[in-house]
């Protein structure tokens, strides 16, 4: 995730593509984007294509009211809401920049998942695509020890 005070979302795709993981790795690991029909995702063409017109990803939409079509992404969204609740001023709980967002994402991706046989998403990423894991760590994400994972808003102010 890229911290942004603005929409549209294609700016975040551009940032991931150019700054964070690079064009080649982005195409390899994010060649398909499955999303809901939220307003921030309406400009599929700009999400799919770079400034030079080359394709970066393909965007597909779930059917309306069918969040189950996004599988484990919905579970991750639920975990994100443990840290970043709806109806709360996110700045007031400590989400102020990319560093604080990285803290939240690091804790979520460090927690063991039953559907991954007790492994964390980071552990799976390190095994399946070490190059991507390295880029994520260079971007500022960190693997947190499983017994130190916090999935509450206090993680943003925890020292």
Regions found by a protein language model. Name each.
Residues 9-12, 29, 43, 76:
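Amphipathic alpha-helical interface surfaces
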Residues 25-43, 63-67:
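Acidic/histidine-rich, metal-coordinating catalytic segments
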């Amino acid at each position: 995730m890229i911290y942004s005070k603005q929409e549209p979302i294609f700016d975040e795709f551009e940032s991931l593509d150019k700054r964070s993981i690079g064009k080649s790795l982005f195409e390899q690991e994010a060649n398909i984007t499955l999303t809901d029909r939220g307003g921030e995702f309406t400009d599929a063409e700009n999400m799919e294509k770079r400034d030079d017109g080359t394709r970066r990803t393909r965007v597909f939409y779930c059917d309306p009211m069918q969040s189950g079509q996004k599988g484990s992404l919905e579970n991750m969204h639920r975990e994100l809401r443990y840290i970043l609740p709806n109806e709360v001023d996110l700045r007031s709980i400590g989400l102020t920049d990319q560093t604080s967002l990285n803290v939240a994402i690091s804790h979520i991706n460090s927690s063991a998942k039953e559907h991954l046989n007790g492994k964390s998403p980071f552990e799976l990423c390190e095994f399946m695509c070490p190059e991507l894991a390295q880029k994520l760590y260079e971007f500022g994400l960190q693997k947190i020890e499983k017994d130190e994972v916090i999935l509450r808003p206090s993680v943003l102010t925890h020292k």
